[in-house]
Amino acid sequence: MIFKPMQHKAAGLPHNPLKAIVAPRPIGWIASRGSDNSINLAPYSFFNALSDDPAMVMFSVQTDSPDHHKDSLRNVEETGEFVVNIVGEAQFDSMNISSENFPYGDNEFIHAGLEMVDSDSISVPRVGKVPAALECVHYETMHLPRNAQGG
């Protein structure tokens, strides 16, 4: 199969196949704290490790418009810290709850009934009982060009 971004419907595919082609994809459950001390927790399917020396991870924030910032990105850019929580099977339902579009400042930990655990080296809490949590310091935000067809 030859894949051309945003031309999937012309090929008879109901959805863009990129997410299915690059698999399995881990879910990065990103916890962040805003400069107003509000806590945010949201899952990101475009998350991965970039390097082990230096240790670096990334998550991709996709928005409807260039002017709209997701709470996670806003918080990470304001405070420079975030936690990547690795989602286990026991957290699937809570992760789905945290993916809802809550107003800025609403704490998804509370909505999803999750335990907040203090991190060791940063001010952002992590999710209790996840298989792993990566305490991170923001290095750089890259703004990628948007596809003219909306992707």
What positions do the PLM features span?
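Active-site-proximal mixed secondary-structure blocks
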Residues: M1-N40, N48-G151
